Amino acid sequence: MIKLNFSRELRLLTPLHFKYVFEQPFRASTPELTILARPNNLAHPRLGLTVAKKHLKKAHDRNRIKRLCRESFRLAQYKLPNCDFVIVAKQGIGKLDNRTLTQTLDKLWQRHIRLAQKS
């Protein structure tokens, strides 16, 4: 049976991990969201999140976005290539409702799966 957890090993934890992804990423974007990816040498994908106070002033709004992103990653992790992913929230992300945000994330994950198959 497949475990759909989001343990510590599936997270980008240090600034070095984030810096690695930001150096030469593959990108998939919408106006509200960008997912950056870079292949890693591990047997699983990892996720990092950046949601700036500049775009979402209230902590509960930032937490909602991060919670939905983590949940989307958790459910898609076995389809995803072995890459380090960083989700960058942009201006206007707070206007998306939960369903729209989830659909947007699913579309971006599919785009990264296709990008990984091409390379």
Swiss-Prot record:
Gene Ontology molecular function: 3'-tRNA processing endoribonuclease activity; ribonuclease P activity; tRNA binding
InterPro entries according to UniProt: Ribosomal_Su5_D2-typ_SF, Ribsml_uS5_D2-typ_fold_subgr, RNase_P
Catalytic activity: Endonucleolytic cleavage of RNA, removing 5'-extranucleotides from tRNA precursor
A matching Pfam family: Ribonuclease_P
Highest rank taxon of the organism: Bacteria
GO BP annotation list: tRNA 5'-leader removal
EC number from the UniProt entry: 3.1.26.5
Keyword Hydrolase (UniProt): yes
Cellular compartments per GO CC: ribonuclease P complex
Keywords: Endonuclease, Hydrolase, Nuclease, RNA-binding, tRNA processing
Function: RNaseP catalyzes the removal of the 5'-leader sequence from pre-tRNA to produce the mature 5'-terminus. It can also cleave other RNA substrates such as 4.5S RNA. The protein component plays an auxiliary but essential role in vivo by binding to the 5'-leader sequence and broadening the substrate specificity of the ribozyme.
Protein family per UniProt: Belongs to the RnpA family.
Subunit structure as annotated in this protein's UniProt entry: Consists of a catalytic RNA component (M1 or rnpB) and a protein subunit.
Protein name, entry field: Ribonuclease P protein component
